[in-house]
A protein has these predicted regions:
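Short gly/ser-rich loop at a beta-strand->alpha-helix junction or flexible surface loop bordering the NTP-binding
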Residues: 1-176
Length: 177
């Protein structure tokens, strides 16, 4: 709703009140049907929340388990959204509201941005043109340092397997993804 006129804000609030729109983050709404009609509504909500965070805070990128999830690496359990700041500042937690879409309920959450390890800004990669995350290499290292042993091992094996599948300097010789 940033930059929206008061008329547009009232219209958004009215649609949200009627249940046509669902507030996913302060100032960000999503069509309720996009959540309720999707076969995996949790994924829709997570991606929408992540997109809202990155739109409002462009210095935050997905990292750790969230980046592993974006890369399609196997995680043994669900994790809260994990973001890292690429600036020198340490932003305060971002509070996301609870979401009610039809009969579906998603709890409110606070996303706590992390500072990069060793003070170096992580390398970034863009997923599907929209969501930014750490590179696969940094994601594997971050997960190895932050997840429990078993889950870290699973993510590391899958990440290293993915890295071994593609040879940047010999693209024509690489196996098809």
């Amino acid at each position: 709703t940033r930059g929206a006129t008061s008329t547009k804000r009232r219209r958004l609030a009215r649609h949200a009140q009627l249940g046509k729109l669902t507030r996913i983050a302060p100032g960000y709404y999503l069509d309720t049907v996009a959540i309720t009609a999707h076969p995996d509504p949790g994924t829709v909500v997570a991606i929408a929340r992540l997109a809202a965070i990155q739109n409002k805070h462009p210095h935050l990128i997905s990292s750790g388990p969230t980046a592993a999830w974006l890369f399609g690496l196997p995680l043994l359990e669900a994790h809260p959204l994990h973001v890292t700041t690429v600036s020198n500042q340490h932003p305060s937690p971002i509070n996301l509201p609870k979401i009610h879409a039809g009969s579906l309920h998603f709890p409110a959450m606070a996303v706590r941005p992390h500072r990069p390890r060793n003070g170096r800004s992580p390398a970034m990669i863009r997923h599907n043109g929209d969501l930014l995350s750490t590179t696969l290499e940094d994601t594997v290292v971050d997960c190895a340092l932050s997840l429990d042993e078993e889950e870290a091992f699973v993510v590391a094996c899958a990440g290293l397997h993915e890295l071994a599948r593609y040879r940047r300097f010999y693209r024509n010789d690489s196996r098809q993804r």
